[in-house]
């Protein structure tokens, strides 16, 4: 588990970055070097099957489980119509196994600070800070309890 987190950090270093990216791909992890990541990223269970869009921003102390997809909902668009947009994952967020977090071109989907996205949830719009969302499509279920 810690090895995958180390590879994610190493992917930005000259020289070793190519080796780290190749190792991530062998492990089934697509985590482009362009993804901005804050400190304390946790990828439990080796993050097998993790796919992260190249324009994603991930805050501090975020936990992302295996099989998560963060990307565009309108992948059929090309050219100028597909420009812009991203997912922003703020600090202290947990994204459960198999969850899908999507944005539309030209827009931003934000997972607010301290929010929890349940396992296998499909998030199609921004999640306010401190809320727990689950289901397909994902909807708020309750407020998360602040960690002590």
Name the predicted role of every residue range:
Residues 76-83:
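Extended, positively charged loop/linker patches that create polyanion-binding surfaces
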Residues 27, 33, 38-39, 44-45, ...:
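Left-handed beta-helix
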Residues 1-29, 130, 136-148:
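Terminal amphipathic alpha-helical/low-complexity segments used for targeting or macromolecular assembly
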Residues 22-24, 34, 80:
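Short solvent-exposed loop/turn micro-motifs enriched in small/polar/acidic residues
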Residues 49:
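Short hydrophobic/aromatic beta-strand element in the GNAT-like acyltransferase core
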């Amino acid at each position: 588990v810690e090895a995958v987190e180390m590879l994610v950090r190493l992917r930005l270093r000259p020289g070793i970055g190519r080796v780290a990216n190749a190792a991530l791909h062998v492990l089934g992890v697509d985590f482009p070097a362009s993804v901005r990541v804050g400190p304390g990223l946790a990828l439990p269970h080796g993050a097998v099957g993790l796919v992260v869009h190249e324009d994603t921003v991930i805050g501090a102390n975020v936990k992302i489980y295996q099989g998560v997809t963060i990307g565009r909902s309108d992948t059929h668009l090309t050219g100028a119509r597909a420009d812009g947009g991203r997912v922003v994952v703020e600090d202290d967020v947990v994204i459960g196994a198999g969850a899908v977090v999507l944005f539309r071109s030209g827009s931003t989907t934000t997972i607010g600070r301290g929010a929890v996205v349940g396992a296998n949830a499909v998030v199609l719009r921004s999640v306010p800070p401190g809320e727990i969302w689950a289901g397909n499509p994902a909807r708020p279920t309750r407020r998360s309890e602040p960690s002590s």
